[in-house]
């Protein structure tokens, strides 16, 4: 199992190119199941979760390849299997997104109950109830969610019980080929939903309101091919901005969009960072200063993103002052805090709230990554700590950060990947 060895006390500065958003690329890849013609996708990151998704699509009969430019070419015209099997699905919760397009286009589909990050309850109930309201018959048997419908799904008004990015995407995908009009109320508003809707509309869907809490989909009989470029990854962008903020550095994030990161940029400025934005870049300069502690409360978009909570927890661990972090989206998402405490951080956890007391310096040690965003916060902590830090279970990072050690080295980090068996 691979690990990272990180040598600390680096000031992280330089320029970094931001990859395409994993959280947009995944639903878009599954949405390609709906198309009767080939699709070309650019700016798709090279990640473990992306490769798993391509393998699931291939299992269904989709022709899925990358060309010499890195573009992903998909042809779902000859799908002949309708099951996403456990051996592929077990590592990734996003695989539930295969179900909606299969049922919408082929009137049947089954997906193994998925796996993924271990950060609390992320039930698929909202996906299932949404599809049922569109007319699908769904049963859970032998670890599989099995769905079928005798004819086309039928549009209706759906109020999502709790704001859910995943369920919003499932319902939106399914409704594109339903009879009549579907209205989604209490829809999630994330930029990745907007990007998926843009992709579906390029294929001939009729979706309006994406990015608001009220999405309308007029069903069409078929979707055709198109070309689409995946939006930049706002969470990767925020992560590299944090890298500069915690180390007193200056980082320029290229090929990204500031308008998807308002809540994060506001908090970075509150922490004392100088942040400048252009149409396609964001520059953060700490001018060599230590950050100030900032209170964080996660919320659905356009609120503060839960996927940036771990990175800001690290910032608060080394900031001047005391801060309160409240996690409202996922339970059990403070697993990075005990590891940061092992590095000399000071914090107390009570329920969904953490109180961080900033310290001047962290110390390198061995830590264990528990999920995608927690793991990157530990790597960044190693970059600024004294001595050497070993980060174990970095397969979590490979699920969501493209070429992470190369990008960090480009900013001056001293980091190397090694196999656990090579440690001696």
Swiss-Prot record:
Pathway: Cell wall biogenesis; peptidoglycan biosynthesis. It is an enzyme of class 2 (transferase). One of its GO terms (molecular function) is UDP-N-acetylglucosamine 1-carboxyvinyltransferase activity. The keyword Cell division applies. The active site is at 117 (proton donor). UDP-N-acetyl-alpha-D-glucosamine binds at residues 93, 122-126, 162-165, 307, 329. Its EC number is 2.5.1.7. The modification 2-(S-cysteinyl)pyruvic acid O-phosphothioketal is found at residue 117. One of its GO terms (cellular component) is cytoplasm. Cell wall formation. Adds enolpyruvyl to UDP-N-acetylglucosamine. This is UDP-N-acetylglucosamine 1-carboxyvinyltransferase. It comes from Haemophilus influenzae (strain PittEE). The gene is murA.
């Amino acid at each position: 199992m691979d690990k990272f060895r990180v040598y600390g006390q680096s000031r992280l500065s330089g320029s970094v190119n931001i990859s395409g958003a994993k959280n947009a690329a995944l639903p878009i890849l599954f949405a390609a199941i709906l198309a009767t013609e080939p699709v070309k996708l650019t700016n798709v990151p090279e990640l473990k979760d992306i490769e798993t998704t391509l393998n699931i699509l291939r299992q269904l009969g989709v022709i899925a390849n990358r060309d010499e430019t890195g573009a992903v070419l998909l042809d779902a015209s000859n799908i002949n299997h309708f099951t996403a099997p456990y051996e592929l699905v077990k590592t990734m919760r996003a695989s539930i997104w295969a179900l909606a397009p299969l049922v919408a286009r082929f009137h049947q589909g089954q997906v193994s109950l998925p796996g993924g990050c271990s950060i609390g309850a992320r039930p698929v109930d909202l996906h299932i109830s949404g599809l049922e309201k569109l007319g699908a018959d769904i049963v859970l048997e032998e670890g599989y969610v099995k769905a079928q419908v005798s004819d086309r799904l039928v549009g209706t008004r759906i109020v999502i019980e709790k704001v859910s990015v995943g369920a919003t995407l499932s319902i939106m995908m399914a409704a594109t080929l339903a009879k009549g009009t579907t209205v989604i109320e209490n829809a999630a508003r994330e930029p990745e939903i907007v990007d998926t809707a843009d992709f579906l509309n390029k294929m001939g869907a009729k979706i309006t309101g994406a990015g608001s809490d009220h999405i309308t989909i007029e069903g069409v009989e078929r979707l055709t091919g198109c070309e689409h470029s995946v939006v930049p990854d706002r969470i990767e962008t925020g992560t590299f901005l944090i890298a500069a903020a915690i180390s007193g550095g200056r980082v320029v994030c290229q090929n990204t969009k500031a308008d998807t990161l308002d809540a994060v940029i506001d908090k970075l400025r509150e922490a004392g960072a100088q942040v400048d934005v252009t149409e396609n870049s964001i520059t953060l300069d700490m001018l060599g200063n230590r950050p100030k502690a900032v209170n964080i409360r996660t919320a659905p978009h356009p609120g503060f993103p839960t996927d940036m909570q771990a990175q800001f927890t690290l910032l608060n661990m080394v900031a001047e002052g005391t801060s309160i972090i409240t996690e409202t989206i996922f339970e059990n998402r403070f697993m990075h805090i005990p590891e940061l405490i092992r590095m000399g951080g000071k914090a107390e956890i009570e329920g969904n709230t953490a109180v961080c007391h900033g310290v001047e310096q962290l110390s390198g040690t061995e830590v264990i990554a528990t999920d995608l965003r927690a793991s990157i916060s530990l790597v960044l902590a190693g970059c600024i700590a004294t001595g050497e830090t070993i980060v174990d279970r970095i397969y979590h990072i490979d699920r969501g950060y493209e070429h992470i050690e190369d990008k960090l080295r480009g900013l001056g980090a001293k980091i190397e990947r090694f196999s656990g068996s090579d440690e001696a």
